[in-house]
Amino acid sequence: MKYGYFDNDNREYVITRPDVPAPWTNYLGTEKFCTVISHNAGGYSFYNSPEYNRVTKFRPNATFDRPGHYVYLRDDDSGDYWSISWQPVAKSLDEAQYQIRHGLSYSKFQCDYNGIHARKTLFVPKGEDAEIWDVVIKNTSDQVRTISAFSFVEFSFSHIQSDNQNHQMSLYSAGTAYRPGLIEYDLYYNTDDFEGFYYLASTFDPDSYDGQRDRFLGLYRDEANPLAVEQGRCSNSAQTCYNHCGSLHKQFTLQPGEEIRFAYILGIGKGNGERLREHYQDVANIDAAFAAIKAHWDERCAKFQVKSPNQGLDTMINAWTLYQAETCVVWSRFASFIEVGGRTGLGYRDTAQDAISVPHANPEMTRKRIVDLLRGQVKAGYGLHLFDPDWFDPEKEDVAPSKSPTVVPTPSDEDKIHGIKDTCSDDHLWLIPTICKYVMETGETSFFDQMIPYADGGEASVYEHMKAALDFSAEYVGQTGICKGLRADWNDCLNLGGGESSMVSFLHFWALQEFIDLAKFLGKDQDVNTYTEMAANVREACETHLWDDEGGWYIRGLTKNGDKIGTAQQQEGRVHLESNTLAVLSGLASQERGEQAMDAVDEHLFSPYGLHLNAPSFSTPNDDIGFVTRVYQGVKENGAIFSHPNPWAWVAETKLGRGDRAMKFYDALNPYNQNDIIEKRIAEPYSYVQFIMGRDHQDHGRANHPWLTGTSGWAYFAVTNYILGVQSGFTGLSVDPCIPSDWPGFEVTRQWRGATYHIQVENPDHVSKGVKSITLNGAPIQGRIPPQAQGSDNQVVVVLG
């Protein structure tokens, strides 16, 4: 069953049936103000932090997709009313027609009902801390119509804990007031004129308004049947205390064929509502702001465009996967309909991996995130697993947060720095390839010399920070020489404690290879020798202790008692995705062992929906292995199709030269390919999800937790750099694809260091891998394509064979 389709010309997903089996969401905002919005206009807004600066309320996991950012319409002649989005009024789909278009940082809602055509476009203008609701109402009947429009948002008390729990204070610490054309919401305890005020404004002069939620909705009612809309007029309520909303009402008389256009503006900051209300009364300014959002993403998407025989790959890579990856870089794991805003801060490993995918499209944000992570590293070399970057930003050290009487105090400086017992063994290592990729993309080699403080005092160059990360992993090894698992590795539920993690040793080896290449480029011969020797020791330990001869794969690790995890002798958790894919991705495994390991992955872990994380799933609790054994079978880390490491398998297969297998794995996970089986998938077909129920669960194939997952960044990185094979380097651009053998070729347009490269890949011999020749602007070249002049257009032809 399908509910919509991809409109690639407009980079939109079009939902033709609003009764999808779950909220399908989108992200509005590219800077500080963000709205998470569903296809039915449910969702919430926040400024910078959904934990501390929530603008509108959200009730997570509610039976219905409520509340939201709604516009109600009422036929004042008949008393009939509906909403432009299907919810919350939910008119019969036999009587009303709805269409929703999720675009890149905007969403469009359209409704045709009883001779009235209505559209609502939601977006956050660049440079503003506000959300625009651009509304058009048209009379398509042959009669004069009198139509009233009502807005509705429910304001939040700002801090999630107070908003959701401490009502004995929050109900009495805020109030609404009416100003000409707007409802102003005052967080009275907060003396800051910016963060202490929210508003909802309109470009029209309202006929009535409500600032009190319960006056607008009425007693024993909800958003589906608000009293004010039913009666055709708000009660002009505004006062201190209790629950607050923003509803502005206006009646319009429309001749046949006539349309009216106006806007609502939801935002933050005292006085900003008046300013933006006046500004957007000129609809040309609305059009210009929307055009700027379109241009923002046109510019980013243009950095890498592909035309291949695989339409699903083209659709996702040319827009949606980059969009999701950058959403994760900007908003981390802050806010979705699953992560509902109670955790402000950066997950160390999450952010380091997210950032590797977008240095070409957003180098400024990539650099910022890398600096954030380096400031969150301690002198010993490990990273703080979860931290607020503001803690260590020298420009924000003296900025005291507004103190609410209803919140838990912020942690002391000592509490911000955790010790070894709370350290995840993989966090810091992801930094190495990400920093290298950033410099390869931008050419900013001086970045390695920039001095950046450690979280626990002192400072060092970026290059020395990288060495500290590598040295930490070399020091914290077990008796076999394999890296200790510490609190956990990438798999948070694999709590090895004093045990050892094969995944981290493979990751350590990959980071070492990247660093050795960097040291060679910088001419640091002593470091080349030191870390080459370190890498050799890692390889020897891994090949000696981690290969399972009977199974023909790499084990997952060892418990603190020395018992192996992931052997052919075991009944549960025999084969694991992370260890086998990273053994190959890192370059540690030989061709022979790599092929055996990935054959085992294909045999034991593959499904039509992607690769399982492990199999068979654990059914018996074993605390030596960790919490993973106490997760339901086929769910999350225990035998689900955990999406994030799936792209590691795509990369691994390209390293082995097996393009057909790489594409088989890619196609299985690609949400585009599940667009017509939504009754199985449930989640959005334009977004990767955290996990898909595994074969040991009754809902096998159901996708869970869309948007905020490192899968998107890794999917983009794996396809662009390894399957399509277009990689930036310190000295040039390389093109070395690994594609399905039946592809005749493909085209890529790639912008790199200010020049554009139009790359034509030809595959006359139908091979998967192997470059026979490269020409640059008609001249044969060997190896990498050197940087060309800024602003130049260059023709590259690559022949495989």
Swiss-Prot record:
Optimum temperature is 30 degrees Celsius. N-acetyl-alpha-D-glucosamine 1-phosphate binds at R333, R343, R349, D350, W490, D492, E637, H644, Q690, T709, G710. GO terms for molecular function: carbohydrate binding; glycosyltransferase activity. SUPFAM superfamilies: Galactose mutarotase-like (SSF74650), Six-hairpin glycosidases (SSF48208). InterPro entries: 6-hairpin_glycosidase_sf (IPR008928), 6hp_glycosidase-like_sf (IPR012341), Carb-bd_put_dom (IPR009342), Gal_mutarotase_sf_dom (IPR011013), GH36_catalytic (IPR033432), GH94_Enzymes (IPR052047), GH94N_ChBP (IPR037828), Glyco_hydro_65_N_sf (IPR037018). N-acetyl-D-glucosamine binds at D492, K636, E637. PANTHER family: CELLOBIONIC ACID PHOSPHORYLASE-RELATED (PTHR37469), PUTATIVE-RELATED (PTHR37469:SF3). Homodimer. This is N,N'-diacetylchitobiose phosphorylase.
